[in-house]
Amino acid sequence: MQLRASVLLSFLGLASVGHAGNVENNHNVCTVRANGGHQDDVPNIMAAFKECGNGGTIIFPEDQSYWIATRLHPTLKDVAIEWRGKWTFSDNLTYWRNNSYPIAFQNHHAGFIISGDNITINGYGTGGIDGNGNTWYTAEKGDTQPGRPMPFVFWNVSEVIVDSFYVKDPPLWSVNIMNGTNMRFNNIYCNATAVDAPWGDNWVQNTDGFDTMDATNIQLTNFVYQGGDDCIAIKPRSYNIDIQNVTCRGGNGIAIGSLGQYLEDSSVANIRVDKVNIIRYNEDMHNSAYLKTWVGALVPQSSYESAGVPRGDGWGSIRNVLFSNFNVQGASAGPSISQDSGDNGSYAGTSKMSISNVAFVNFTGWVDTEKSVVSTVSCSEVHPCYNIDYDNVVLYPGKNATTAGTGSCKYTADGGVHGLSGC
């Protein structure tokens, strides 16, 4: 009787070594080699995820550069990914506009989505994703259009570790968690730079660094961001988020929100953000730490992020938030609260989101303003905010100012703001 090699190996108790294109499977360890040039590597990558994505190891070697020309969405379980090489998204804008995975939230799209459980990704300081975003930035020149693919999205995941990884020039948000539980990120670097933009022009809107939504028990440490939007954004239904050691260069700083854009509960609770450097870059650094919610009415919107339909009127609460140890170098504003997103001038103070138990602790540095007010608290007349604490917040209105700035408040509960001069 003649036996095939794979059958004979099974009789001998040995695992076979398989090859599928540029994928080598050695005892449930899949090593993926790039095709080279601008040949699509996604078929080989998906083959590796299929062969070794359940209880195995997947390796992208450091000397390999992969061309991502088509969308991909693997579901993985009990897998370790040694991501030492670089993925580069193709510059085929037409393909991505027409084929990226639609994300209902804010009319966005994704090019690469990971789902599953017990996933470890290590970039070892060399691995990551180049989103080829400069092609988009130059084409749109600051007027973001639908269809840009988010390059690194976690959707329906749990027990995830990501270490020593980068996302360079994302077309849209860099790292996005949507329905994730028990996730740890460490040594993450995100950079969105429009090399063709005139100095002072922001062509990299919507290139958030790290966003969470429907997320619980998320830890982020040692994070560096350069871009033109939220460095970090804590979005609806995020709970138990712990963030430490962050540097934000340019953009909007650390955001809670925006919340209440949709007719749903957008609550957020138990957030700590500690040890943050906020650095002005490209004449752009709008905020340092801020909370933003929508008005309590459906208001017509023209932006693509609202899909051109009325938005707002969401509800919920923001509670137990700590921002501490911020060094602010040239942001346009100090810590702030604004509950009038989406307003057309008729609905100020109507937000249905309540805000309480928020602390800003140990803020130092300067704010790029000619006014004396460096921090504003503008809450909701429907739910006046309370237990808003400022503790050792000393920010100067200008780099050479000698007198610390003050604050302004409205729609707050009586005695609801403590420690902010002017309130």
Curated annotation (Swiss-Prot):
Its main location: secreted. Keywords: Carbohydrate metabolism, Cell wall biogenesis/degradation, Disulfide bond, Glycoprotein, Glycosidase, Hydrolase, Polysaccharide degradation, Repeat, Secreted, Signal. Gene3D superfamilies: Single-stranded right-handed beta-helix, Pectin lyase-like (2.160.20.10). It holds the Pfam family Glyco_hydro_28. PbH1 repeats lie at residues 215-236, 238-258. It catalyses: [(1->4)-alpha-D-galacturonosyl](n) + H2O = alpha-D-galacturonate + [(1->4)-alpha-D-galacturonosyl](n-1). InterPro entries: Glyco_hydro_28 (IPR000743), Pectin_lyas_fold (IPR012334), Pectin_lyase_fold/virulence (IPR011050). Residues 1-20 form the signal peptide. PANTHER family: EXO-POLYGALACTURONASE, PUTATIVE-RELATED (PTHR31736:SF12), PTHR31736. Belongs to the glycosyl hydrolase 28 family. This is Putative galacturan 1,4-alpha-galacturonidase C. It comes from Aspergillus niger (strain ATCC MYA-4892 / CBS 513.88 / FGSC A1513). The gene is rgxC.
